[in-house]
Design a protein with these regions (language model features):
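Ligand-binding pockets and gating/stacking loops
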Residues: 1-401
Length: 401
């Protein structure tokens, strides 16, 4: 690692810092090639075809069966992956439909230049939401590189400072007027107004977090700016390498990635969505296996990168303190949201198993949000509930600090 890329040491060394990375797609998976057999439980299970690229790291990851968010909503399940809450039902939950990465971003605050990074390769990222229900905008491969390593010109920085000052002044006026308006509202309108004020406060907090980083230099790298459009495999590989650099330089501690597919890649003619509605056609199933195997190859590459790098802040490796998750909010192309495909690697969890939970249709079903809560607690976030959780996953443990 270049000296200029070494993260700044923390003043508080009492707890290790943690990171969270999620890889996803918007169309689910071909489940017959993804999940181990239902009775092939625990360590020593036979790794299925789609997960074969992860085999070298089998002691570093866990496969989960029968976890889901308890809904039957097809494509609308995609944005529910990291929250467990459907966006239009957010008002019924204390924290709305905030996603895990954004909850971590709130927890980390201004500890890093980017509280979170939401990125995409050939598919919009639909899984990241703030507590006010705002979907976090995503950036592409080139945008990711420039955000991490390209310094803004002095004039642009000066403009950004002035913009922050103006925005803060406007927010001050808004909050002052709000105090007057609120008194005359009905109870129903007061609830809506409270949501509006929460959004204003959220923006205020975001502005506060930006300011300290405007004058701090970005890390230097000898990596060249990647060229987009070289194909799904090359673009996705370049993106996970940038994600590893983002973790390595402590530029962020929360990243979500959504990956897709471009017609013509892997010698295939068609679209991911069309292939996902395979109707048991052998050629479509073969296409899905190729696309999804590539996602797992790049996840394996990310695991290897994190595993091979020393954690300059905590000691150990970056993988020891980075939870890497793969998941889909829609389980399969035919619109099922039952038994979501979920794999978790690293993060200090005890891995190496296929964990099977009660049938999602049974009265004893375990919410997928329990896994999300475990990830949050592992990260250091103090919470006993998250979204639709009923608790943590009791048998998914991690090494305590």
């Amino acid at each position: 690692m270049l000296e200029s890329m070494v993260p700044v040491a923390r003043a508080d060394q009492s707890k290790p810092i943690k990171r969270f990375v999620c890889l996803s797609n918007n169309y689910g998976i071909y489940r017959e090639a993804f999940f181990p057999e239902a009775d092939d439980v625990g360590a020593g299970y036979e790794i299925p075809e789609t997960l074969k690229p992860l085999e070298a790291h089998r002691n570093d990851f866990t496969v989960f069966s029968n976890l889901d968010h308890g809904n039957t909503i097809g494509h609308q399940g995609v944005p529910v992956l990291l929250s467990g809450v459907r966006p239009h039902l957010a008002s019924y939950y204390q924290e709305g439909n905030i996603s895990v990465d954004q909850k971590i971003a709130e927890y980390e605050g201004a500890n890093t230049r980017f509280p979170s990074m939401t990125v995409r390769v050939n598919e919009s990222n639909l899984v990241s939401f703030t507590r006010t229900g705002v979907q976090v905008p995503d950036i592409d491969l080139r945008g990711m590189f420039r955000a991490l390593f390209i310094e803004d010109p002095a004039e642009k920085k000066a403009t950004a400072v002035e913009k922050l000052k103006r925005q803060n002044s406007i927010l001050d006026v808004v909050m002052e007027k709000a105090k007057v308006v609120e008194k005359d509202l009905s109870k129903r309108d007061q609830r809506k107004f409270a949501e509006y004020l929460e959004a204003v406060r959220s923006l205020e907090k975001k502005l506060e977090l930006q300011e300290p980083w405007l004058d701090r230099p970005k890390p230097k790298t000898d990596v060249s700016e990647p060229q987009q459009g070289k194909g799904t495999e090359a673009d996705l590989r370049a993106m996970v390498e940038l994600m590893a650099l983002a973790i390595q330089t402590d530029s962020t501690r929360a990243i979500t990635l959504s990956s897709g597919f471009v017609n013509g890649d892997f010698g295939l003619s068609g679209g991911y969505h069309g292939f996902s509605h395979h109707g048991n056609r052998a050629d479509h199933i073969d296409a899905l296996k190729k696309i999804e195997n590539n996602i797992m190859r790049q996840m394996a590459h990310l695991i290897e990168l994190l595993k091979s790098q020393e954690d300059m802040i905590n000691g150990g490796t970056l993988l020891d303190h980075t939870t890497v998750m793969f998941g889909c909010g829609m389980a399969t192309g035919p619109h099922s949201t039952k038994n979501l495909p979920l794999v978790v690697a690293g993060g200090g969890f005890k891995h190496g198993e296929h964990k099977v939970y009660p049938d999602p249709e049974s009265a004893h079903r375990i919410p997928a949000a329990n896994l999300l809560l475990s990830i949050l607690q592992n990260h250091g976030v103090e919470a006993d509930r998250f979204g639709t959780s009923s608790g943590t996953l009791a048998d998914f443990e991690w090494k305590q600090a």
